[in-house]
């Protein structure tokens, strides 16, 4: 039985106050079912940041992984862009 490919998302870090954990906001564009307008939906994921390298505003790529805690199922794969703060 082959293993399914893991999901990858891109988003912005909105919180880095926890040790080795960041909160990443991921935006997706969804078409409204009745009116047809494209609407932005935002979802927040807790992601594991082993080296505490991410800061608020960084653009990061997160990858799905095994459950690391009650809320963490994602890890930071790479930092795509540093924030200018």
Curated annotation (Swiss-Prot):
Pfam families reported for this sequence: Ribosomal_S17
Gene3D superfamilies in UniProt: Nucleic acid-binding proteins (2.40.50.140)
Subunit (UniProt): Part of the 30S ribosomal subunit.
InterPro entries in UniProt: NA-bd_OB-fold, Ribosomal_uS17, Ribosomal_uS17_bact/chlr, Ribosomal_uS17_CS
An annotated Gene Ontology molecular function: structural constituent of ribosome
Keywords on record: Ribonucleoprotein, Ribosomal protein, RNA-binding, rRNA-binding
Coiled-coil intervals: none
Any single GO BP term: translation
Species this protein is from: Desulforudis audaxviator (strain MP104C)
Similarity comment: family membership: Belongs to the universal ribosomal protein uS17 family.
Function as written in the Swiss-Prot or TrEMBL entry: One of the primary rRNA binding proteins, it binds specifically to the 5'-end of 16S ribosomal RNA.
HAMAP family referenced in this protein's UniProt entry, alphabetically: Ribosomal_uS17_B
Entries under CDD domains matching the protein: Ribosomal_uS17
GO cellular component, one term: cytosolic small ribosomal subunit
Name this protein carries in UniProt: Small ribosomal subunit protein uS17
């Amino acid at each position: 039985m082959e293993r399914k490919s893991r999901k990858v998302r891109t988003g912005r870090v909105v919180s880095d106050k926890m040790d080795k954990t960041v909160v990443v906001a991921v935006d997706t564009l969804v078409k409204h079912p009745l009116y047809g307008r494209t609407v932005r939906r935002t979802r927040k994921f807790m992601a594991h940041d082993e080296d505490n390298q991410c800061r608020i505003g960084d653009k990061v790529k997160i990858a799905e992984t095994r459950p690391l805690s009650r809320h963490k199922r994602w890890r930071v794969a790479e930092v795509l862009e540093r924030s200018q703060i």
